[in-house]
Amino acid sequence: MGSLRGLRLVAGSCFRSCERDAFSSLRLTRNSDLKRTNGFCSKPQESPKPPDQHTYSHRVPLHKPTDWEKKILIWSGRFKKEDEIPETVSFEMLDAAKNKVRVKISYVMIALTVAGCVLMVIEGKKAARRNETLTSLNLEKKARLREEAAMKAKTE
């Protein structure tokens, strides 16, 4: 029992000394970040250079639009005339304009689909009044094919 207790005491003191050495090399700075000092001379940290005034602050890459992309920018309502479009535009602006045009085209396609459905219903009702149903058309076609087969059999 005594040796176990002594072993625990030695291990505890060893742990405390290691802990003390580790925490003495770490100190809190004003920004409350842990900073390790290892006893060597350290260079003072340099502040990052301020960005140039000539570059964009968001660092957005710019793109020179083609004629087709200029038309898309006009169709989307972003610009009124082609003269108003700047020489370079951001990719985000182009994507937003393309998405608007896609939505407008999909609305047109939906309207054309609905108009086509209504037109087919009207044409179907007109054909039903003239008794041009699919059943009657199929029966006429089969009768005509039978007659042609009978005529062919007689000639042979």
Swiss-Prot record:
Residues 37-57 are annotated as: Disordered. GO terms for biological process: cellular response to hypoxia; neuron apoptotic process; positive regulation of apoptotic process; positive regulation of release of cytochrome c from mitochondria. Its main location: mitochondrion. One of its GO terms (cellular component) is mitochondrial membrane. Residues 78-104 are annotated as: Required for proapoptotic activity. It comes from the Eukaryota. InterPro entries: DUF1075 (IPR009432). Keywords: Apoptosis, Membrane, Mitochondrion, Transmembrane, Transmembrane helix. The chain crosses the membrane at residues 105-122. It is found in: Mitochondrion membrane. Signal peptide: none annotated. It is a single-pass membrane protein. Interacts with HSP90AB1; HSP90AB1 is essential for FAM162A mitochondrial localization and pro-apoptotic activity. Interacts with VDAC2; the interaction is probably involved in inducing mitochondrial permeability transition. Belongs to the UPF0389 family. Proposed to be involved in regulation of apoptosis; the exact mechanism may differ between cell types/tissues. May be involved in hypoxia-induced cell death of transformed cells implicating cytochrome C release and caspase activation (such as CASP9) and inducing mitochondrial permeability transition. May be involved in hypoxia-induced cell death of neuronal cells probably by promoting release of AIFM1 from mitochondria to cytoplasm and its translocation to the nucleus; however, the involvement of caspases has been reported conflictingly. PANTHER family: GROWTH AND TRANSFORMATION-DEPENDENT PROTEIN, PROTEIN FAM162A. This is Protein FAM162A. The lineage of its organism: Eukaryota, Metazoa, Chordata, Craniata, Vertebrata.
